[in-house]
Amino acid sequence: MNREEVYLSLGSNLGNRESNLAQATIALSINFEITDIISSSYYVSEPLYNKDQPEFLNSVVKFCTTLKPFEVLDVTQKVEKMLGRSNKLVKNQPRIIDIDILFFGNSVIETEKLSIPHPMIALRKFVLLPLAEIEPDFNVPHSKITIDDLIYNCPDKSRVVRHFMDVQA
């Protein structure tokens, strides 16, 4: 079976955001068909669309899998549900966890249920910065566009900064 590299965006702005992202990453890694999981640092970002909500904590996760794209979508939706995300969320509202598939190998998929590459990547600095951290030489599949190109041309001028966790000795 072919193993594909997959990139996910994780975001949370309700509850213990650090714990939500960590639990989502752990839940993904428990799936025996997901291996070699790597997570970026966490990044704090202000909400882009609905400004009347808490700041987000975001990360990007990379892994290898033999699962197919719609199977990965199913896994991500199960993780979201396990962590308490409601299926009835209104777009751009606060959420415990949000997991989006950014890239799936060189796949290009456009259906009502799934779009790969994610259509909003180039517009979201909170996705681009953590992606560049774990994959600085990344090129968008089927193009010569680099992660640096995407960051340079990103229209998102919102504040996105690396998050440093408070660790008690």
Predicted features by range, described:
Residues N2-L10, L14-K91, R95, N106:
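Nucleotide and nucleotide-moiety/phosphate-recognizing core
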Residues M1-E4, V167-A169:
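Short, Lys/Arg-enriched, disordered terminal segments
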Residues L48-E55, L67-D74, K78-A169:
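Flexible, gly/pro- and Lys/Arg-enriched active-site loops
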